[in-house]
C-alpha cells in the first residue's frame, strides 16, 4: 500500500477474543516532521557556532583576546581612584574559560556600564544582573600581573584598537549561545580620556 505525505491511512487491528475492528490512524508525514525538527535544531546549533566564530573574528579585528565561559564567582565591587572628578571603580568576577579550562579574573571598568553612578559605591545595575553560573562572552586584554585575568572588556571610545587598548566587550550568552548586548558600551564618560 502506497502513501503520500500528509495522507491519513487506516489499519485494521484485531482485538483479542473478538472480531471487532478498531481503526488506528497513522500519519505518513509524522516521521518527516521529526526529521524536519532535527534539521532545524542542527541548523540552530550550527548558526550559534558560526555566530561565536564571527564574534571571535570580530574580537581579533578589534585587537582583543576572545573568551567565553561560566561565571564561577562574583560580581563584586572594588573602589577605584578619581580621574577628573569621576571615580574609576571596578566590578570583579571569575570566569572558567571554555577555551583552555582555566579560571580568569575579570576586571570590569564600571564607568563604561550604562547607568554608571560616578559617586556610587556599588556594582552598576547592568553588571549586577550577572550571576554565578551565567555564561559570558568577553573581548579584552589578557594580563598576568597578580594572576591570570582579562580587562579592557569595554568600548575604547572609538579610538583605533590596539593590543594595549582593544575595542572590547562583555556580553551575557543566552541559553542557545547567542550573545546579548555589550554591557560595557557606554560612551558617556569617554570625555575623561580626550
Segments (PLM) and residue ranges:
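N-terminal secretory signal peptides that target proteins for export/translocation
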Residues: 1-35
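Intrinsically disordered, low-complexity segments enriched in Ser/Pro/Gly/Ala and basic residues
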Residues: 2, 29-32, 47, 121, ...
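Sec-dependent signal peptide recognition
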Residues: 35-43
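Hydrophobic h-region of N-terminal signal peptides that target proteins for export
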Residues: 42-51
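OB-fold and OB-like single-stranded nucleic-acid-recognition modules
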Residues: 52-194
Amino acid at each position: 500500500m502506497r502513501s503520500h505525505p500528509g495522507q491519513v491511512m487506516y489499519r485494521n487491528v484485531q482485538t483479542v477474543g473478538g472480531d471487532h475492528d478498531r481503526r488506528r490512524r497513522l500519519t505518513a508525514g509524522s516521521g518527516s516532521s521529526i526529521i524536519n525538527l532535527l534539521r532545524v535544531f542542527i541548523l540552530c546549533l550550527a548558526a550559534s557556532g558560526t555566530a561565536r566564530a564571527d564574534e571571535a573574528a570580530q574580537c581579533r579585528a578589534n585587537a582583543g583576546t576572545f573568551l567565553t565561559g561560566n561565571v564561577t564567582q562574583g560580581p563584586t565591587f572594588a573602589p577605584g581612584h578619581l580621574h577628573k572628578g569621576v571615580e574609576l571603580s571596578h566590578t570583579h568576577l571569575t570566569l572558567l574559560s571554555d577555551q583552555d579550562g582555566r579560571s580568569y579574573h575579570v576586571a570590569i571598568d564600571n564607568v563604561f556600564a550604562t547607568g554608571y553612578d560616578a559617586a556610587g559605591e556599588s556594582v552598576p545595575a547592568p553588571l549586577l544582573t550577572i550571576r554565578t553560573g551565567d555564561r559570558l562572552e568577553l573581548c579584552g586584554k589578557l594580563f598576568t600581573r597578580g594572576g591570570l585575568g582579562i580587562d579592557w572588556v569595554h568600548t575604547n571610545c572609538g579610538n583605533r584598537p590596539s593590543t594595549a587598548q582593544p575595542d572590547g566587550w562583555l556580553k551575557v550568552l543566552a541559553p542557545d549561545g547567542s550573545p546579548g548586548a555589550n554591557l560595557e558600551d557606554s560612551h558617556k564618560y569617554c570625555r575623561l580620556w580626550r
